[in-house]
Amino acid sequence: SRGLGDVYKRQAMDWDTVIFDAGGDAVGATALGRYHQDFMELEPGSLEVFNVINIRRPLAGTVERILHLQEEMQIYSRLKITGMINNTNLAQMTGPDELRDGYEMIKQVSQISGIPVKYTSGRREMLDIFLSEGHDPEYIGTPIAIDTYMHRDWDSWIKGLSD
């Protein structure tokens, strides 16, 4: 069986960034933990572990749930979360309130846990509104504007399946 080290050495030597999406829960963190030894072989400071948070998802709907999930993720992955990303959204139904609400909750999580907010992501128009409101940049991090290129009309798509 090959570890991440083998993959990294053979294929990723010229990559600056490799992203693992572990799903944000204990199950995904356990799968990520399988590569713990490989991660420890990386240059110190080169590994960043982000918790991407959408407070509109049931498992991350309260400060307490987010803190609990972060604790579990760190235990099962055997990695320290180095930053949080506010990615609060409701897909096409997202408005400025989503980023505002995410900001308020993630700010509390950061103050309690000491884990910094590294990024805030959102659809460009919603992010622009949010950023114009004068929130504390310490709990926004670097803004990442998302432009949506593929729009899915779920009702039409589902109807098409039943035809």
What positions do the PLM features span?
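Generic structural signal for residues positioned in beta-strands
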Residues: V7, G83, Y119, T142-A145
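Walker B catalytic acidic pair
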Residues: A22
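N-terminal regions of ATP-driven nucleic-acid and macromolecular assemblies
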Residues: F130-D163
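Conserved catalytic-core segment of NTP-binding enzymes
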Residues: A26-E138, D153
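Short, small-residue-biased leader/transition segments that mark boundaries at the very start
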Residues: S1-Y8
